[in-house]
Amino acid sequence: MAVLCPARVSVAENKKFKLHTLSAMMMGLFTGSFAYAETQNTSNQEQEMPVLVVIGEKTQRSIYETSASVEVFDQDTIERTPGATEIDDLLQLIPNLVDSGQSNNMPTIRGIDGSGPSVGGLASFAGTSPRLNMSIDGRSLTYSEIAFGPRSLWDMQQVEIYLGPQSYIQGRNTSAGAIVMKSNDPTHHFESAVKAGIGESDYSQTAGMISAPIIQDELAFRLSFDQQKRDSFVDLAAFEPAGDPKKIEMNSVRGKLLYEPSALDGFKTTLTLSHMDSRGPQTENINVAGNEAFRPVYETASFTTAWDIIWHLNDLFTFENNLVYADFSYDRYTNPNSRGDFNTDGKEFHIEPLLRYIALDGSVNTLIGARYYQSSQDDMYIDAASAYPMDGRTKAKSVFAEVTYALTPSINVNLAGRFEREQVKRNVSHPRYKLDYDETSSVFLPKLDVAYTPVQGQTYGIKAAKGYNASGAGLAFNSMQFTGFRPYEFEQESIWNYEFYTRHRFSHSVEVLTNLFYNDFDSMQMTQTTSSGDVFIANLDEASTYGAEIGSRWYATSSLELFANLGLLKTEFKETTGNTKELPRAPKMSANVGLLYDFGQGFEFSSNAAYTGSYFSESGNSEKFAIDSYWVANAQLAYVFEHGRATLYATNLLDSDKTTLYLSTNNTLDQLKQQPRMIGASVQLNF
């Protein structure tokens, strides 16, 4: 089947939503799905689709009770997604989310840069403040871990990707969205697995897992590890002390101990120890002609201890607590001839107790919690002339509550609120470029959500919620002619999010989820570059985004599942000069389609294709740095047998090499491109 790509349209001229060929095709699939499902309701042709349970909002809900725009990948879905071994493999499939590839830039969600107001050196000097939160088993990763670190999908129970502000429930650094990853817990029966994979670009994966009881039905453990290696597709020159920048490696090791004492009914506790490390080039942008590519190398490492408690006190109340302590470090190594090293060592701690109440008749569901977070990190920037010591300290205290009340049998009202107080310190000890920032700010983050369910399987709702990103300070510099650093401060950013959502389930085989949104920003933080080359973070007067996400799944038969998702987006902001522009990396349309097909005796075929519309690389909206629309297609064939599965897959099946981002506004050669096609295979054995 041929894929029809839209002709290139000037980004500057394409100022309106256009539901062109791709939209029409997808909407046709939606409506065609409804018609078929309603008229072909025979048990031998259809399979009842499972109901997804969402866990990332601190309360378990079905997808039909969840107002957030969220993509859910359980373990089975991850295994059946072509070539999915790390979180980036999933992010590239989500409409209204742009993941440009390996670089300083984290994904944008609904046009909002998940990296925060700055990336690279400016972010390092200012103290990073991302808008996208990524957590693994309750611990939120740092900016450098999200951008450069390991995010393995091995032995993951579920991954949830939230589009839109999550500040009211997740707290700091979630104004763009959140990625919640939950690994598998120990089991009270023995299970184990090993996996080996190989692929082009010298890719390899070696992974294993074992889970077993120690005391039957009381004490159990689980151990898992994953190592993935590959070579960068960009030709890079080796230098000391970094070695070969082409070599990319990530390692994850996790151990869990689960205790459910028989003498204490309803109580369970889990202790988790995990280590993650990675190394690779800071960016995989193509080489500029005539220059040797002495690309900086980033190495990250972290060790985390997490202790979780769940105690069902009685039929009404449940107490939970999550405690996390982590050590982390990351090091940037550069060519000594143009040295710009950066080293960080840090620690963080948080504790989050919760109390839940659920009425016996289910009419009231209440959550009350508190959170204390503190982190400290010591940084050092080292150039050819000197070293610049820096340090940062953050403390955040918050209390939050959520109440869901059944106003009538068909109307539910959800009220939530979070009060957060955050202290941020940033210090640079250099006598010429001294920075001493110490500010405390408070914010109240409310949410109101009203859902109407006239009949089972049909829900309509509206919600309003507030998000924020903390204030801060940093050191500005000149990108054209470096003459030193200049200290500056920027204010807190806030966002009001309004959404209308629907959830539909037809004949137990068709699912349609929609979210229409409008986001209004106050004092949006954005990197600004003056005509003279000065780079710093400033607060904008006006910014807004609006659009929609539409998703559908159709269990056409007991062996065939089809899905299609569409994202629409419009963004605008007013520069400090007064000019109105579009936000960078904010395509007006993005989409994906795919299928899962079981056939023969144990064979599975899965494929997907994702489309990303044209967008600008930078806030100036220059046509010179505009990105053409692009596709990526993936396919996988698996054979499932009694004790495992064997898989053959291809990512970027058509070997598309479109540009995804221009990293510099000084030239058009410094650009990221799609990773080339990779064909690989893996074998997993279960015992």
Swiss-Prot record:
Pfam families: Plug, TonB_dep_Rec_b-barrel. Residues 1-37 form the signal peptide. Keywords: Cell outer membrane, Ion transport, Iron, Iron transport, Membrane, Receptor, Signal, TonB box, Transmembrane, Transmembrane beta strand, Transport. It is a multi-pass membrane protein. The keyword Cytoplasm does not apply. NCBIfam families: TonB-siderophor (TIGR01783). It comes from Vibrio cholerae serotype O1 (strain ATCC 39541 / Classical Ogawa 395 / O395). This is Ferric vibriobactin receptor ViuA.
